[in-house]
């Protein structure tokens, strides 16, 4: 499965648009508590554990996106948009959502 933020794939023709696909993942409140309480984890202004959790959430969202595209018979997803939103009471959770258009391609 190929993923692209652009509307086309270089060297390939889109032969069918299969539909819009999405994937989401939500990080629970504990990651924020750990993040703010665990300043000791910050090295050079970055938090390794927080970035690791975000990366994991993004991977889950992309996995869901790919599974939906595959179920539609697609071999690629184009025009992908990645969003990060705070949700829940007191914005205590972070949602990573990805969306795009599932397509069938041919070289």
UniProtKB/Swiss-Prot annotation:
InterPro entries, sorted: UPF0145_dom_sf, UPF0145_YbjQ-like
Lineage: superkingdom: Bacteria
Membrane-traversing stretches: none
Family in the record: Belongs to the UPF0145 family.
Record protein name field: UPF0145 protein CKO_02237
Organism: Citrobacter koseri (strain ATCC BAA-895 / CDC 4225-83 / SGSC4696)
Lineage per the UniProt record: Bacteria, Pseudomonadati, Pseudomonadota, Gammaproteobacteria, Enterobacterales
């Amino acid at each position: 499965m190929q993923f692209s933020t652009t509307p086309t794939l270089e060297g390939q023709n889109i032969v069918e648009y299969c539909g819009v696909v999405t994937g989401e993942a939500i990080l629970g409140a504990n990651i924020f508590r750990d993040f703010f309480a665990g300043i000791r984890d910050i090295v050079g202004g970055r938090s390794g554990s927080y970035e690791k959790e975000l990366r994991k959430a993004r991977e889950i969202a992309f996995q869901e996106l790919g599974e939906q595209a595959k179920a539609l018979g697609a071999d690629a997803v184009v025009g992908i948009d990645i969003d990060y939103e705070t949700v829940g009471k007191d914005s205590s959770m972070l949602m990573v959502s990805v969306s795009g258009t599932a397509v069938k391609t041919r070289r």
